[in-house]
């Protein structure tokens, strides 16, 4: 394969990934692995070296004939020039450039790049994949538990690559300066704005970006490869020397120097590695003293002037002497050149005094750990000796983990093997401190910086352990380790700097509950109480000691002291002293340690607060009043925030009360304690919901406290922790209901106002200055807003209406009104509507997308933008619930309207959003961002914006069109589309593995398609349809649109096509179902159908592959379905749903292909569904298993709905009926929101527990029992929901199958042979008929579908009758038996008690098809002559024995009491049955007499007649029903037993009125033929009336009726006379004969 192919290295990468995922049993043979590796040896040995441009290759290229892919090709001048451009750009052989350009041309459209840009992409991609393979290879060979054969094979192969002459290590080392120079040249070229020798056809910015990122990544990967080669002992001394020479040439700071340091460390470890001999002696493994001496001289004894950076010399030197000393202490025979004092100790001391620990922090820690990130709390006390600032682009996390792992190894070795040096360092620092204290040498006005290596070592340890929390756990788990011993040894120091550094180390080691418990226990030993600070210095620290220190400083630094006098408490103003720097650092360290411990464990925090001797809350607030540096005061506020971090209930309320009281009563605001009053910032009048003065002095005092930026951030974080609801139930306010009631309106409104005004001010500053500080403050404010919005339990409002007072009784003080009026979310929502606030939110959303995508963007900006998106999403979500489920029921809920006034008086936030066009564009861009934190919020906001139902309970499709127009017309529209494509393609592999997680993008698109009805919508634009506002689609082939291979639509099809590779894929992920639903919807939508189907057809056999790949449910699965878990049932549902979508797509395509006559595709589809090319069918009805694929899809008919739960889960103590809104006759499309149900029951149980008697243990035991019941309830509800979905999916699948079957029968019969067609029809009937015969309530939906299928296909099954001759009828016994079985099944289905009207309507239609067909063929050519053979056969099919009384009961009830088609068909069938045979007719008349049916039918039919006449409806609307009824009445009237029941005076009146009405419409010849036929039927009845009833009887009964009869006669005669001179239709001839007969009868009666 060509090296420029994107899949060139894929096979090797796959093998290596398989081995790495399971190294002990990789299921990969070593032989196969070596064969694969050997095929890449040439690439590895060549490494990144390129054949340079040369004259011979240039001459061949310019000749116009070039060998590409083993074939000689003629190339044009443009191709030659582009190849030369690449050659100049990359300094690459011209022929190779031609091959590379060919690959670029092939992929340029898919990549949406020019051919040269695409070629550059493949060039750098090949290099990246080569290095990735080598990195994986060297990493795998170093795995500890690697299978032995694989390990041996890999080591042998790598050894061959590293041999002399083919030295991979040397090649890597030599490549580093080459790449370094290239990076420098690229940066210079970018600064200069031009590239020497590059043709203008190459996009300058594209090349700069691609080449710079590629070369930087290559440097990092090579450093990893070298490190891993050194770890597996494939590094030689010469390689070490080469790297050492390279290191000497680097300045500080230099990224490459930092990258190669781990390799040098790894080599030193291998050189100094020891081995244990059988006699228990230990010796050097390499056993080469000369090498050790040479390394020592090169690192330690080399002159400083040989190093451009002494810092790197010291960093490498301290590592060398530490490891060398460790080795010397383990081996028995120490090398002769080593003298501990001179070689190790003195060298180490010199390096340490030169500041190596500080340099390690500056050069190896700071580049990977920003000061504002968590884990850098110790940085405030660290003084770096170097003024170097490191500003690198982000480095791979794996490299950072390598560096910190090596640093940790160094620190552990230094503590274990250099304890004497540590003791010396400590003693020197103590001596220096005592000397400086006794004899200060500083000159007034001059500050001399002093550095203490022992303290710097503590800070180095802090920086190392905070990198990886698991290392902290390892530290505390091993109390026998040297590191733990070093920690306990350090506790006894009395030097301020050491105390500070040691305390900060402890704070850094406190990152989880276990470490917090360990530190708490370590400091919990009792200590005698002392009175002054000097006495405190003689003891080891404890919590009592620390709080005594706090109280000591309170007594000396608080400006106003509270004293006890004879008249009570009084305040005494004092002159507070100043705190020195060392004391301030100690105080800050102690506060930080306390903060770290209480933050990790709520129980420890509670224990602290319950200790009246310590009283931390009051102590911290008193400390806050002292005259302290700002950094200490900020640390105090952070300590309060740590106390609030996990606080709940009364503890949280106590913190709120203390804070509120402190702001009102604190001496800080009575006496100027260093805080000047802060002026109110200039804020828009609409930025706050209330005037500033309305908040009283409390808000002013908050402003005075938070003058400093860091103080503002810390205070807002404190408010966030106090406000955040930590309870799972989230049903009560997180502050006391009466907070501040004695001096203001109770609640936390001043704090909300402060956060809002702070957010507005910081937003303005960010907009103007773009400083990081303001963005950090914005982030803190946004976190507070999120905590407030999340804390509003909207479920209380929802369930309050459903469950009435039961919810309200469980609220704090049983008052929902108080909960709503005091909850800060309501006032915050109102504030969010002010222009200055939502402008700040939108400004964050509109932050430059390119800046966000830059790898150097600060993380703070990213998380702040993400937080703003979360708030916008939460507001839209909250409003949706309020508008839809709360506002309409405010009166019912008992909520005052003014509480939720904002939801009524203000427009929806959705409308606010729609006015920010640029925000919507940026929001859509964020979907495609590399920062995954934006995706969910951005997608959900777009979902709310396109949702037309959730806001104000009204649909407004224009908003969906507006949103689509905004994005479609934006300059970034194409970029947005590509962003959606990239995000989907980067996610789908992950979603495939999760199986039950949906794609947010596909969910948005699917919902939008359904809501918009497939017309002009955002979903169509994103999928790649170029649609105009007039709903016209243009098929474009540009990338991004469906006409190109680069579009989201084609990505979906690629994704779906991948599923067809393996047959019988059981685990159908949700994302696959979503993709199929979208494509199926596009196929069925009239606007997109043609384009979508053409795209599918462009993929040969895709639909056929999808059909073939669909799995079939096994009998075992069907039998066990009732016992499946909810996850297993969902898996079956997804499988069935995917099948449904495939059948829907296929049905749409078949219908389209049949309509345009594309028989080629029809043949393919028919062959896949009916398998005409795989099975030889006989002409007889086979009893074997069906060979039709489409019938295999009906495996779902074997599922018994009774095995799936229809009833509600019944668990004692749970009344689930109150959560139901729709639940009808056991069939349910209602699903439970399991999470909400569990929440409300937890609320009930906790409230009930508080009222229980007994001990705390008994209450807890009772609650545990209830929780176990809740778990069972959750499982039952989830299973119930899964069953509901499964039944819906089964019904959907049946409907799709019925449609597809109908299309095959109706549209494809011409492309199916008669044999196959007949066999298919009867196979379908045999499959579905048994289910129709006997069904129950649970199978009604299934039978409704299958009975419609029978009605559709039965006429086709009967078509052979027309081809049979009478003499052939007796020989086709199998055919007649089949029809007989169908009739029996239909009759039984009609009689079934659980059949509804729709089912019976289908069955009547099927039965009528049979009756109609046989009626046609029992009359020869439509005449009166009856074929006795056919009639005899027909009478044998339907005998009186089949027509039971139960069947007649159902049939006559439908004829009497139903409407529409069911009534019409039942009447027609009754009429037909009278003509089947005299026996059946006699049987029917006897039944009529027993049930008095005829009179009842006449009454029902007369009522229908009367309604028609009174409503003035058009006769044509009900014509078919009238005809059916009239035919049956004619039949009744022709029988002497029922004629008198038919010819009632009421019916005669209605009949005469109808005839008069028809005569009024003009001449009879102008009536439409169907109406003429109805008139014929009426005239037949009229003649029977005149023949059976005398005019005298009519006159005696109703003289008006008699007059109407004579009037009707004249009208009829006039109508007939009017058209006498015209050619008459058969209907008119019949009417004319009947009119003449009527005239003669009337004349006869007159005579």
Swiss-Prot record:
Cited InterPro entries: Nup186/Nup192/Nup205 (IPR021827)
Entry's Gene Ontology cellular component terms: cytosol; nuclear envelope; nuclear periphery; nuclear pore; nuclear pore inner ring; nucleus
Subcellular location, principal: cytoplasm
Single Gene Ontology BP annotation: nucleocytoplasmic transport
Domain of life: Eukaryota
Sample GO molecular function, one term: structural constituent of nuclear pore
Keywords (A to Z) from UniProt: Cytoplasm, Nucleus, Transport
Location relative to the cell: Cytoplasm; Nucleus
Similarity section: Belongs to the NUP186/NUP192/NUP205 family.
Summary of the function given for this chain in its UniProt record: Functions as a component of the nuclear pore complex (NPC). NPC components, collectively referred to as nucleoporins (NUPs), can play the role of both NPC structural components and of docking or interaction partners for transiently associated nuclear transport factors. Active directional transport is assured by both, a Phe-Gly (FG) repeat affinity gradient for these transport factors across the NPC and a transport cofactor concentration gradient across the nuclear envelope.
Full protein name: Nucleoporin nup186
Organism (species): Schizosaccharomyces pombe (strain 972 / ATCC 24843) (Fission yeast)
């Amino acid at each position: 394969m060509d090296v420029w192919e994107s899949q060139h290295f894929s096979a090797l990468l796959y093998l290596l990934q398989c081995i790495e995922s399971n190294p002990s049993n990789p299921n990969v043979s070593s032989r196969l692995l070596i064969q694969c590796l050997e095929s890449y040896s040439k690439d590895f040995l060549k490494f990144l070296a390129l054949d340079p441009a040369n004259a011979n290759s240039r001459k061949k290229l310019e000749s116009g004939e070039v060998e590409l892919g083993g074939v000689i090709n003629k190339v044009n001048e443009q191709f030659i020039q582009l190849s030369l451009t690449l050659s100049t750009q990359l300094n690459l052989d011209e022929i190779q450039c031609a091959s590379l350009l060919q690959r670029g041309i092939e992929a340029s459209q898919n990549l949406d790049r020019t051919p040269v840009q695409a070629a550059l992409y493949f060039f750098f991609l090949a290099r990246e994949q080569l290095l990735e393979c080598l990195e994986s290879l060297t990493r795998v060979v170093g795995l500890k538990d690697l299978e032995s054969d694989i390990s041996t094979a890999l080591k042998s192969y790598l050894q061959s690559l590293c041999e002399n002459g083919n030295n991979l290590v040397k090649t890597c080392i030599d490549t580093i300066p080459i790449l370094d120079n290239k990076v420098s040249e690229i940066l210079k070229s970018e600064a200069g704005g031009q590239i020497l020798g590059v043709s203008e056809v190459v996009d300058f910015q594209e090349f700069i970006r691609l080449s710079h990122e590629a070369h930087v990544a290559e440097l990092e990967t090579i450093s990893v490869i070298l490190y891993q080669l050194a770890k597996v002992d494939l590094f030689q001394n010469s390689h070490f020397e080469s790297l050492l020479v390279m290191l000497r040439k680097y300045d500080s700071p230099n990224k490459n120097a930092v990258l190669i340091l781990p390799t040098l460390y790894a080599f030193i470890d291998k050189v100094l590695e020891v081995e244990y001999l059988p006699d228990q002696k230990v010796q050097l493994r390499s056993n080469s003293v000369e090498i050790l001496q040479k390394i020592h001289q090169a690192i330690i004894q080399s002159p400083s002037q040989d190093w451009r950076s002494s810092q790197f010399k010291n960093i490498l030197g301290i590592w060398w002497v530490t490891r060398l000393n460790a080795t010397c202490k383990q081996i028995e025979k120490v090398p002769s050149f080593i003298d501990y004092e001179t070689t190790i100790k003195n060298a180490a001391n010199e390096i340490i005094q030169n500041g190596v620990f500080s340099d390690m922090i500056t050069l190896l820690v700071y580049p990977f750990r920003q000061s504002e990130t968590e884990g850098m709390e110790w940085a405030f006390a660290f003084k770096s000796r170097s003024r170097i600032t490191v500003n690198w682009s982000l480095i791979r996390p794996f490299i950072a983990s390598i560096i910190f792992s090596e640093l940790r190894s160094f620190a552990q070795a230094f503590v274990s093997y250099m304890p004497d040096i540590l003791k010396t360092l400590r003693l020197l620092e103590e001596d220096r401190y005592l000397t400086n204290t006794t004899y200060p040498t500083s000159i007034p006005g001059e500050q001399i910086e002093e550095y203490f290596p022992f303290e710097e070592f503590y800070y180095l340890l802090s920086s190392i352990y905070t990198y990886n929390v698991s290392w902290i756990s390892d530290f505390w788990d091993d109390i026998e380790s040297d590191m733990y011993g070093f920690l306990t040894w350090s506790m006894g120091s009395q030097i301020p700097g050491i105390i500070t550094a040691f305390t900060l180390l402890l704070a850094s080691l406190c990152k989880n509950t276990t470490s917090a418990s360990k530190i708490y226990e370590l400091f919990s030993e009792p200590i005698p109480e002392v009175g002054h600070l000097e006495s405190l210095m003689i003891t080891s620290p404890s919590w009592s000691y620390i709080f005594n220190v706090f109280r000591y400083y309170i007594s000396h630094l608080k400006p106003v002291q509270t004293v006890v006098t004879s008249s009570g408490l009084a305040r005494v103003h004092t002159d507070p002293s100043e705190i020195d720097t060392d004391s301030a650092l100690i105080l800050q360290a102690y506060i930080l340690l306390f903060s770290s411990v209480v933050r990790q464990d709520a129980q420890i925090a509670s224990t602290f607060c319950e200790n009246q001797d310590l009283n931390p809350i009051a102590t911290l607030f008193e400390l806050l009043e002292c005259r302290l540096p700002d950094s200490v005061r900020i640390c105090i506020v952070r300590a309060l925030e740590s106390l609030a971090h996990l606080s709940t209930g009364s503890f949280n309320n106590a913190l709120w009360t203390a804070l509120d009281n402190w702001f009102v009563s604190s001496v800080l605001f009575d006496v100027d304690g260093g805080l000047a009053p802060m002026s109110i910032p200039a804020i828009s009048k609409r930025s706050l919901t209330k005037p500033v003065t309305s908040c009283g002095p409390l808000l002013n005092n908050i402003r005075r406290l938070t003058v400093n930026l860091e103080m503002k951030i810390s205070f807002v974080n404190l408010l966030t922790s106090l406000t955040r609801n930590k309870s799972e139930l989230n049903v009560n306010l997180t502050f006391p209901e009466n907070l501040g009631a004695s001096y203001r309106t109770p609640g936390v409104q001043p704090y909300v106002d402060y956060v809002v005004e702070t957010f507005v001010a910081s937003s303005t500053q960010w907009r103007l200055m773009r400083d990081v500080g303001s963005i950090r403050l914005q982030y803190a404010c946004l976190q507070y807003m999120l905590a407030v919005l999340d804390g509003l339990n909207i479920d209380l409002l929802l369930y309050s209406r459903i469950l009435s007072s039961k919810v309200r009784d469980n609220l704090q003080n049983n008052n929902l009104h108080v909960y709503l009026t005091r909850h800060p979310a309501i006032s915050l929502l109102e504030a969010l509507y002010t222009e200055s606030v939502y402008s700040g939110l939108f400004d964050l959303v509109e932050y430059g997308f390119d800046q966000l995508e830059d790898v150097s963007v600060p993380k703070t900006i990213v998380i702040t933008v993400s937080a703003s998106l979360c708030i916008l999403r939460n507001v839209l979500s909250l409003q949706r619930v309020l508008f839809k489920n709360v506002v309409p029921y405010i009166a019912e809920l008992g909520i005052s309207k003014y509480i939720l006034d904002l939801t009524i008086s203000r427009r929806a936030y959705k409308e606010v959003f729609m006015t920010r066009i640029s925000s919507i564009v940026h929001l859509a861009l964020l979907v495609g961002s590399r920062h995954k934190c934006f995706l969910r919020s951005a997608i959900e906001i777009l979902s709310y914006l396109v949702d037309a139902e959730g806001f104000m309970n009204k649909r407004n499709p224009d908003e969906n069109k507006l949103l689509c127009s905004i994005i479609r017309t934006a300059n970034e529209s194409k970029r947005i589309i590509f962003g959606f494509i990239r995000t989907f393609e980067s996610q789908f592999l992950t979603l495939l593995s999760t199986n039950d997680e949906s794609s947010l993008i596909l969910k948005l698109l699917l919902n939008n398609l359904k809501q918009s009805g497939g017309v002009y919508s955002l979903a169509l634009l994103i999928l790649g349809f170029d649609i105009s506002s007039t709903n016209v689609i243009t098929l474009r082939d540009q990338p991004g649109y469906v006409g190109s291979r680069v579009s989201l639509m084609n990505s979906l099809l690629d994704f779906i096509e991948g599923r067809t590779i393996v047959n019988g894929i059981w685990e159908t992920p949700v994302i696959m179902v979503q993709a199929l639903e979208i494509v199926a919807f596009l196929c069925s939508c009239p606007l997109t159908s043609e384009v979508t189907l053409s795209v599918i057809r462009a993929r040969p056999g895709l639909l056929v592959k999808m059909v073939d790949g669909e799995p079939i449910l096994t009998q075992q699965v069907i039998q066990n379905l009732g016992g499946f878990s909810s996850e297993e049932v969902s898996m079956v549902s997804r499988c069935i749903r995917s099948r449904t979508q495939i059948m829907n797509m296929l049905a749409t395509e078949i219908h389209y292909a049949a309509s345009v006559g594309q028989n080629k595709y029809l043949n393919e589809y028919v062959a896949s569904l009916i398998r005409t090319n795989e099975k030889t069918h006989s002409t007889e009805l086979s009893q074997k298993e069906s060979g039709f694929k489409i019938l295999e899809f009906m495996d779902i008919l074997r599922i018994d709905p009774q095995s799936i739960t229809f009833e509600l889960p019944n668990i004692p103590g749970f009344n689930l009926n109150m959560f139901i809104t729709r639940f009808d006759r056991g069939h349910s499309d209602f699903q439970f929101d399991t999470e909400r149900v569990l929440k409300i029951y937890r609320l009930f149980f906790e409230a009930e527990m508080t009222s229980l008697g007994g001990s705390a243990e008994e209450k807890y035991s009772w609650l545990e029992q209830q929780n176990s019941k809740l778990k069972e309830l959750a499982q039952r509800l989830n299973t119930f929901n899964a069953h509901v979905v499964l039944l819906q999916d089964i019904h959907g699948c049946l409907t799709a199958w019925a449609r597809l079957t109908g299309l095959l029968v109706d549209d494809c019969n011409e492309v199916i042979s008669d044999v196959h067609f007949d066999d298919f029809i009867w196979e379908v009937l045999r499959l579905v008929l048994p289910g129709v015969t006997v069904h129950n309530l649970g199978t009604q939906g299934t039978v409704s579908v299958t009975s419609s299928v029978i009605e559709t296909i039965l006429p086709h099954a009967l078509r052979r009758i027309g081809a049979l001759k009478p003499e052939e009828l007796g020989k086709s016994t199998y055919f007649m038996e089949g029809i007989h079985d169908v009739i029996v099944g239909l009759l039984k289905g009609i009689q079934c008690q659980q059949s509804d009207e729709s089912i019976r309507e289908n069955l009547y239609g099927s039965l009528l098809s049979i009756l109609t067909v046989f009626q046609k063929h029992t009359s020869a050519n439509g005449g009166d002559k009856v074929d006795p053979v056919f009639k005899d056969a027909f009478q044998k099919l339907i005998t009186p024995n089949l027509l039971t009384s139960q069947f007649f009961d159902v049939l006559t009830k439908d004829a009497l009491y139903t409407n529409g088609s069911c009534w019409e068909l039942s009447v027609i069938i009754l009429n037909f049955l009278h003509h089947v045979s005299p026996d059946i007719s006699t049987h029917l008349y006897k039944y009529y007499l027993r049930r008095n049916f005829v009179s009842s039918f006449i009454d029902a039919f007369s009522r229908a007649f009367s309604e028609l006449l009174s409503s003035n409806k058009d006769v044509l609307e009900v014509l078919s029903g009238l005809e059916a009824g009239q035919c049956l009445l004619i039949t009744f009237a022709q029988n002497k037993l029922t004629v008198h029941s038919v010819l009632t005076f009421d019916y005669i009146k209605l009949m005469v009125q109808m005839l008069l009405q028809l005569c009024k419409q003009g001449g009879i010849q102008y009536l439409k033929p169907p109406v003429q036929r109805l008139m014929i039927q009426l005239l037949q009845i009229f003649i029977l009336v005149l023949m059976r009833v005398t005019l005298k009887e009519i006159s005696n009964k109703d003289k008006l009726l008699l007059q109407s009869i004579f009037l009707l006669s004249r009208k009829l005669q006039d109508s007939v006379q009017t058209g006498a001179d015209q050619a008459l239709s058969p209907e008119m001839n019949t009417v004319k004969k009947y009119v003449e007969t009527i005239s003669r009868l009337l004349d006869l009666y007159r005579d």
